[in-house]
Design a protein with these regions (language model features):
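N-terminal Rossmann NAD(P)H-binding glycine-rich loop of SDR-like oxidoreductase domains
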Residues: 5-24
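NAD(P)H-binding glycine-rich loop region in Rossmannoid oxidoreductase-like domains
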Residues: 49-88
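NAD(P)-dependent short-chain dehydrogenase/reductase
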Residues: 150-204, 210-214
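Active-site Tyr-X1-5-Lys
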Residues: 119-122, 133-161, 190
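Conserved C-terminal active-site "lid" loop/helix of NAD(P)H-dependent oxidoreductases
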Residues: 210, 244, 264-289
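Amphipathic terminal alpha-helices
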Residues: 279-281, 292-305
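Conserved Rossmann-fold NAD(P)-dependent oxidoreductase catalytic core, especially the SDR/UDP-sugar
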Residues: 94-137
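Mid/C-terminal beta-alpha module of Rossmann-like enzyme folds, strongest
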Residues: 219-267
Length: 305
């Protein structure tokens, strides 16, 4: 057994895929979430990351030595309840960090997001250290946690590894994000339903297949600390697409999806996010390359729905 890993938010859009992959790599995994488990076939406990006493109990009971912290409120839902989003995303991050300090656990994986960038971030091609003035409370909360992450790493108190994820394409139901359309379109195509898109047809955003996101994250966690050149999160991306281009790809693989547009508040969020990502730092440091392009992502995910 390589590591004993606790995963928060394990039933969410990303967590469930990390559970399966980490178990397949001979790790012990304790999955946790705030709701009952009807999805995962592994040890599971109810855990709210705001409950430090419960967290301390679980870390000791299961002899945990790593945490993957996915518990969060996402971008679109976050705008509907900014104060709760700040509390869950930021206090939750600090609670997990404090639990690790108390229990002598050094290593944490925590996902950041392209939401940390803003309109001053050279959105046509965003490098790892662009100016950041996020326009959503989700992005603000992620950026605040990035600064805390830098502090813990710089002071050598913890070893927190992180990637700024773009839109993630998987067969799990979307969870309240601005890139949800990418998966919703696949579901409607497979179910032969019409789709109404909440973004403009030419809105370009970076995306990646969930397997690429998982593989890159675990590879980053497994690398020697000396090979990690950043104390803050790495950029990552696989491809860029727009609703109109994604529609063309879906039709090219044999699904006659009908789509119209009803643009909502998420357009303003998307307009403040990168169109393309420079992820050369991650690729150079851990020798990572994606396995899925846009066509193969659509084909693979729609087959799984």
């Amino acid at each position: 057994m390589k590591n004993r890993i606790l995963i928060t938010g394990a039933l969410g859009q990303l967590g469930q895929f990390f559970v399966k992959s980490l178990i397949s790599k001979n790790n012990y995994v304790l999955a946790t979430d705030i709701k009952e488990n009807k999805l995962l076939n592994c040890d599971f406990e109810i855990f709210d990351i705001m409950d430090e006493e419960r967290g301390d109990y679980l870390l000791k009971k299961y002899n945990i030595n790593q945490i993957y912290n996915f518990a969060a409120i996402l971008s679109a839902k976050g705008e509907q309840n900014p104060l709760l989003t700040w509390e869950i995303n930021n206090a939750g991050f600090i609670n997990i960090a404090n639990l690790c300090l108390k229990n002598n656990i050094k290593k944490i994986f925590w996902p950041s997001s392209i939401a940390v960038f803003g309109r001053n971030s050279n959105l046509d091609l965003v490098n790892n250290d662009e100016p950041m003035h996020p326009e959503t409370i989700y992005g603000v909360s992620k950026l605040a946690c990035e600064k805390a992450m830098f502090y813990f790493n710089y002071k050598n108190l913890l070893d927190i590894r992180s990637i700024r994820f773009p839109g993630i394409v998987s067969n799990s139901k979307p969870g309240g994000g601005t890139t949800d359309y990418i998966v919703e379109m696949l579901y409607c195509a497979k179910q032969k339903k019409n789709y109404t898109c909440f973004l403009k047809d030419d809105t370009i955003l970076p995306m990646m297949h969930v397997n690429d996101a998982v593989d890159a994250s675990i590879k980053l966690m497994e690398f020697d600390k000396g090979a990690i050149s950043l104390n803050h999160p790495y950029n990552i991306s696989s491809f860029e697409t727009s609703p109109s281009k994604w529609l063309e790809i879906i039709r090219s693989i044999g699904f006659d999806l009908n789509m119209n547009y009803n643009v909502d508040f998420r357009q303003n969020i998307a307009d403040s996010w990168p169109k393309r990502i420079d992820d050369s730092s991650l690729r150079n440091d851990i020798k990572w390359v994606p396995n899925f392009n846009d066509f193969h992502t659509a084909k693979n995910i729609i087959d799984l729905i």
